[in-house]
Amino acid sequence: MEEEQLLDYEEEQEEIQDKQPEVGGGDARKTKGTYASIHSSGFRDFLLKPEILRAIGDCGFEHPSEVQHECIPQAILGMDVVCQAKSGMGKTAVFVITTLQQLEPVDGEVSVVCMCHTRELAFQISKEYERFSKYLPGVKVAVFFGGMAIKKDEERLANDCPHIVVGTPGRMLALARSGKLKLDKVKYFVLDECDKMIGDADMRRDVQEIVKMTPQQKQVMMFSATLPKELRTVCKRFMQDPMEVYVDDEAKLTLHGLQQHYVKLKEAEKNRRLLNLLDALEFNQVVIFVKAVKRCEALHQLLTEQNFPSIAIHRQMAQEERLSRYQAFKDFQKRILVATDLFGRGMDIERVNIVFNYDMPEDSDSYLHRVARAGRFGTKGLAITFVSDENDAKTLNSVQDRFDISITELPEKIDVSTYIEGRTN
């Protein structure tokens, strides 16, 4: 793969030839079917290391979410876990806290491997590991993905071997095949957004090859917001008697506190309507999803010209540029982000309270992951979808049928208290 080429598995597949050279037992399966925003018990009840509790306190978290309450107590005992839960419900913290709690760092040994399907998500997960391990100075974290020079990764592994490695399957496999990344001491193996990796045949092959290089006795954990029944079966083949946690069944996988509306209009009317809505609505930060790179750039330019300063992120940017723009948006340097679907999964920006589907997503899965950028962790938010033709209408109907929800036409006036926390009209 050429270094400047920007691939992620959502858009196209990395080609292998271009790459350079304890298990818990018990039968504690659980299926949860109710939403609970927080539990009265706190993180202290999990008997975590004081250093981890201190970091959790710094993040402002007091009570575990439903998925954390269900997973963490069993996971910190070493049990394999397969978990489906709504976006924004704190799945990342489950495996980050769980692996840090159990980790006993040994110099020169990789103990934790965490893989996900996009580079941005890998970068974000590595930052979460750094955040929760800030009072564990002996713990070293590294992130490896394509689009960056592989030599730097090899030097890091040789000179300052991390205990925790986060990355995308393509780059991880290249490093493992070359012998630079040694996986024979791995104790904890995590797949985030596992449906993307297990559901994609090419990526699944990469994952399987990596798994074969790890010890048979290890803890395996897999997480996703969408996990069809047929994929659950495949996921469980990687595990030994896993605990299964499904927080809300698939038909009810809607986001608590998220208002969802559509606007029927012609293609040529989209820009004017978007500008009017940005004028009328109150927002902290907004993400606007489009279907193609050219549309992303054009809309970004239009918004800037109309005094709505924005940031654009798409797959044709250099990797450093993409990460830099992502961080700039996360740091609140601009309030509007225009993006293609590569930003649609797993990205966690706490201030986003409105998502626009300027272009209709391809399917109901993409819809869920896009609108989940608003209303993270059970907070309020607003999702507005533009419907401009018959195909758009069909997709919207399929979303409503699958998730058993009613997406209504956008009213002329919206009560600000329905989509911004702590506001009254």
Swiss-Prot record:
InterPro entries: DEAD/DEAH_box_helicase_dom, Helicase_ATP-bd, Helicase_C-like, P-loop_NTPase, RNA_helicase_DEAD_Q_motif. A motif (DECD box) lies at residues 192-195. This is Spliceosome RNA helicase DDX39B homolog. One of its GO terms (biological process) is mRNA export from nucleus. Gene3D superfamilies: P-loop containing nucleotide triphosphate hydrolases. It is an enzyme of class 3 (hydrolase). Residues 72-245 form the Helicase ATP-binding domain. CDD domains: DEADc_DDX39, SF2_C_DEAD. Belongs to the DEAD box helicase family. DECD subfamily. The keyword rRNA processing does not apply. ATP binds at A85, K86, S87, G88, M89, G90, K91, T92. It is found in: Nucleus. Its EC number is 3.6.4.13. Interacts with rsr-1/SRm160. GO terms for cellular component: nucleus; spliceosomal complex; transcription regulator complex. Required for spliced RNA export out of the nucleus. May play a role in spliceosome assembly. Residues 1-31 are annotated as: Disordered. Residues 257-418 form the Helicase C-terminal domain. Its main location: nucleus. Residues 1-15 have a biased composition (Acidic residues). It comes from Caenorhabditis elegans. Keywords: ATP-binding, Helicase, Hydrolase, mRNA processing, mRNA splicing, Nucleotide-binding, Nucleus, RNA-binding, Spliceosome. Disruption phenotype: RNAi-mediated knockdown prevents germ cells from entering meiosis and results in the accumulation of unspliced mRNAs in the cytoplasm.
